[in-house]
Amino acid sequence: MLDIQLLRKDLDGVAKRLADRGYTLDVAAFSALEAERRAIQTRTEELQARRNSLSKQIGAMKGKGEDTSAVMAEVGGIGDEMKASEVKLGEIQSRLSDLMLGMPNIAHESVPVGKDEADNVELRRWGTPRQFDFDVKDHVDVGTPLGLDFETGAKLAGARFTMLRGPIARLHRALAQFMLDTHTQLHGYSETYTPYIVNPEILYGTGQLPKFADDMFRVEKGGAENTITQYLISTSEISLTNTVRESIVDASALPIKLTAHSPCFRSEAGSYGRDTRGMIRQHQFDKVEMVQVVAPDTSYAALDEMVGHAEAILQKLGLPYRVITLCTGDMGFSAAKTFDLEVWLPAQNTYREISSCSNTEAFQARRMQARFRNAQGKPELVHTLNGSGLAVGRTLVAVLENYQNADGSVTVPEVLRPYMGGMERIDAPVQAS
């Protein structure tokens, strides 16, 4: 959530910066609510002052033995008007809150202004795409004989679900374990196991609600009269970031660095017809997430560090990639700045997103009321960052495509072999003649 004081000081300036993000701020609606709020607060202050004056007058009158009934009646009337004003003010504050909850974060000044992914800026590349001396297959054709089972996944749960079997399932697990070990042993993160189901207020904290309810899987329990609504997490960023919700963290505890391996559940409501083949876009997929909670003056250094942590995974796997700075129109709702890592997929002859690392500054912290005590001992909002380290399914796709062999086998990257019992290659089972 944005700082409402910023809107009050520079409404037109905020509207301009939100327009760069493709969001049209209803300036008239905000101004009208603010005017009404100020009028009520001014009137309430006047009433409070009048009531205080009358209370003193009543005391003096009683000391003189005078009749106070008329003054007492006026005080009672003031009390009734103040209660009505409180109700009205609460309604206005609620409408302001609803308006604020729908506003995306303001982009950092270093973010390129643009409309969509066509305006993103490439920063750097690492690795050289492999030159194949045979016809390259995509991950579906490579993986199906090795244990990718799209047919059973669809039979069990419908489109965009996949079952993994045998060595492919083991390779998927090996990737997640390798990522966790790298982040915990080399990058200083604390491994965390989180709930996969969370309450609605948790999603308000990280910005998925109210705007993206259609992208979430909702879970309801209880009878018709006592229904409890919860949601499956779309990323463990949600649960990891909310661990500091409604708390004041000691400055000495910062930075807090958490990582988790979890399934992620997304309805992909706006993705009809996109990436329908294979594992690129799934309703359920695994991801190793990185979250940092830091002091405001260190958050952009932390963002660079987090990008480096995601890059390290790709480099250790020997997968070519590039780093992209997202433009204002392509960033996620809560982000102030985002870097995407895109891995090379030879069958598509292009780079595809495999990690997204974002600094939300105080946007999520304000919604969660997550604070720390600064050097002056005063509570101050923390900054929160999140990043994929990496999406496990898409990393599996990249390994299958980049490490495929002409005979249909897949070479296991060296860093994964300890997690695969020393296996160097995944071969398709021999078909009976």
From Swiss-Prot:
EC class: ligase
Gene Ontology process terms (BP): selenocysteine biosynthetic process; seryl-tRNA aminoacylation
Family matches, as NCBIfam families: serS
Disulfide bond sites: none
Protein name, entry field: Serine--tRNA ligase
InterPro entries attached to this UniProt entry: aa-tRNA-synt_IIb, aa-tRNA-synth_II, aa-tRNA-synth_II/BPL/LPL, Ser-tRNA-ligase_type_1, Ser-tRNA-synth_1_N, SerRS_1_N_sf, SerRS_core, tRNA-bd_arm
Function: Catalyzes the attachment of serine to tRNA(Ser). Is also able to aminoacylate tRNA(Sec) with serine, to form the misacylated tRNA L-seryl-tRNA(Sec), which will be further converted into selenocysteinyl-tRNA(Sec).
Domains as described in the record: Consists of two distinct domains, a catalytic core and a N-terminal extension that is involved in tRNA binding.
Annotated positions binding ATP: R266, S267, E268, E353, I354, S355, S356
